[in-house]
């Protein structure tokens, strides 16, 4: 049975030769070189992923939604009742939530995964529950390090199993009342930013309660003293089961040499953790949308990422990842279906990249 250490060790490097071939092919397509902008760079990125066999392509698509409750909800950092996590998880199994509708439109399957819902088991939800909610980070750690490591490994294996069954494009999502608080704590730790700079309204927290949320994040960091150079330490001390789960999806997809679409602010925090745990995951990450949550810009700057969509979204659930899947497919279509300049006897002068 593979250990977490072995999984991290086996994350492949991108295929530089395949990327060079892809760039050469794209430059010869029926258009001025570079005129399709980031669609071209996305195709080259995909070509370098070993799990796609040297060419941009999309098979089955999946959005993995990690569902869990948080002890820090008790600190008054969320307006929604905790039971909403379980209610919405059940709604996901019926296909009626935002991510389900957007994923269906994109032709993707949604996997609803219970990693720590504080309720009875829900039919149709994948059971990876660690506990009924994590610890209150304002008074102590979210979980033990061993719990975090075990969940990372379990989710990574599950992701790789889906890859073996034909999934080639993953999206990450989450569901959990109060989970923007631990996400803000993680972003604060990884980026060295004060809580005031990264704490937002989450699911419509009234402005009058923001200062309390900022204070809770500061207390969580002061009490737990997470090490910013140790991603698992940060996850276990000021994270949550859903955040660990998303990190596991990223690690698993990278291990299989496959792309993973990030969602919003919660996924940025998981990406920061994943990149700290295993820097080799970075080339497999695709940012979907620019979250409207306050700390998004800081997190994305630290990740050196510019999302493809600016939609003022902050729903979470993996909604942005689902919405961006057609962009990935468009990059593949461009690569495979456009004609070539040579076939039409077109010779463009050098330096024509900006031609229209």
From Swiss-Prot:
Catalysis performed (reactions): 5,6-dimethylbenzimidazole + nicotinate beta-D-ribonucleotide = alpha-ribazole 5'-phosphate + nicotinate + H(+)
Biological-process GO terms, alphabetical: cobalamin biosynthetic process
Pathway(s) annotated for this protein in UniProt: Nucleoside biosynthesis; alpha-ribazole biosynthesis; alpha-ribazole from 5,6-dimethylbenzimidazole: step 1/2
Database matches in InterPro entries: Nict_dMeBzImd_PRibTrfase, Nict_dMeBzImd_PRibTrfase_bact, Nict_dMeBzImd_PRibTrfase_N, Nict_dMeBzImd_PRibTrfase_sf
Active site, renumbered: 317 (proton acceptor)
Domain of life: Bacteria
Gene3D superfamilies: 1.10.1610.10, 3.40.50.10210
Single GO molecular function: nicotinate-nucleotide-dimethylbenzimidazole phosphoribosyltransferase activity
This protein's UniProt keywords: Cobalamin biosynthesis, Glycosyltransferase, Transferase
Enzymatic class: transferase
Regions crossing the membrane: none
E.C. number(s) listed in UniProt: 2.4.2.21
Pfam families in alphabetical order: DBI_PRT
Family from the record: Belongs to the CobT family.
UniProt xrefs under NCBIfam families: cobT_DBIPRT, PRK00105.1
Assembly with partners or alone: Homodimer.
General function of this protein: Catalyzes the synthesis of alpha-ribazole-5'-phosphate from nicotinate mononucleotide (NAMN) and 5,6-dimethylbenzimidazole (DMB).
Official protein name in the record: Nicotinate-nucleotide--dimethylbenzimidazole phosphoribosyltransferase
Species name: Salmonella agona (strain SL483)
Gene that encodes the chain: cobT
């Amino acid at each position: 049975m593979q250990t977490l250490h072995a999984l991290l060790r086996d994350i492949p490097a991108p295929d530089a030769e395949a990327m060079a071939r892809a760039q050469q092919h794209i430059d010869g397509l029926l258009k001025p070189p570079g005129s399709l902008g980031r669609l071209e760079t996305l195709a080259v990125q995909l070509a370098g992923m070993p799990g796609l066999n040297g060419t941009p392509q999309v098979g089955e698509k999946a959005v993995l939604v990690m569902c869990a409750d948080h002890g820090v909800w008790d600190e008054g950092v969320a307006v929604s009742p905790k039971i909403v996590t379980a209610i919405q998880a059940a709604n996901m199994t019926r296909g009626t939530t935002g991510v389900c509708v957007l994923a269906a439109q994109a032709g993707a399957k949604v996997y609803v995964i219970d990693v720590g819902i504080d309720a009875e088991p829900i039919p149709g939800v994948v059971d990876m529950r660690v506990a009924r909610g994590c610890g209150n980070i304002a008074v102590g750690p979210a979980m033990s390090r061993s719990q975090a490591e075990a969940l990372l490994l379990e989710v990574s294996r599950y992701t790789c199993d889906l890859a073996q069954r034909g999934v080639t494009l993953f999206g990450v999502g989450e569901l959990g009342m109060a989970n923007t608080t631990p996400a803000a704590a993680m972003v604060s730790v990884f980026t060295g930013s004060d809580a005031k700079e990264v704490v937002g309204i989450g699911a419509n927290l009234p402005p009058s309660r923001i200062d309390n949320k900022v204070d809770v994040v500061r207390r969580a960091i002061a009490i737990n003293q997470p090490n910013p150079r140790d991603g698992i330490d940060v996850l276990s001390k000021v994270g949550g089961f859903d955040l660990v789960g998303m990190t596991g999806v990223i690690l698993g997809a990278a291990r299989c040499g496959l792309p993973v679409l990030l969602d919003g602010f919660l996924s940025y925090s998981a990406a920061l953790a994943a990149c700290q745990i295993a820097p080799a995951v970075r080339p497999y990450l695709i940012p979907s949308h620019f979250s409207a949550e306050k700390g998004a810009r800081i997190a994305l700057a630290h990740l050196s990422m510019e999302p493809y969509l600016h939609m003022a979204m902050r729903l979470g659930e993996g909604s942005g990842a689902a919405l961006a899947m057609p962009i990935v497919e468009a990059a593949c279509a461009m690569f495979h279906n456009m004609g070539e300049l040579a076939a039409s006897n077109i010779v463009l002068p050098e330096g024509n990249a900006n031609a229209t």
